[in-house]
Amino acid sequence: MQPPNRKSCYNFRVTEIVKVLDGDTIDVIIDLGFDLYKKERVRIAGVDTPEKRTRDLEEKALGQDATDWLKEQLDGAISGEDDLVIRTELVGGMGKYGRLLGWLYIGDETESINERMIQQGYAWEYDGGTKKKDFQELREIRGIA
């Protein structure tokens, strides 16, 4: 997973986090400039989290953990001095379901929330192909094996 270079992407400033739908999808209001704002559904790029809406109780619990972790990361991200920025590719910045594909950055951080999700065991790396469902891997990274 390689986030886009700052010079080869669009950077959208988030003015409001409307809702965290699950561990890899959020609804936000972005500032387009000139007093124009747009509500966007954002698919967090390069990651896949366990599903919250499933009959599999193990996956459901891990999916809720990922959602809660993301909410915690975003809590206060736009109310303080730091901005939440969504960085998207210049070409191909939309996913197959019409969602904006983005890397999330808070303030001047150089590491994206997307990368931290993987490193801390809340998501698998995902390139749009076959989804991974190795729950044991996530538990081991988080130390809850």
Each language-model region and where it sits:
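Small beta-barrel nucleic-acid-binding modules, primarily SNase/OB-fold domains
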Residues: M1-A145
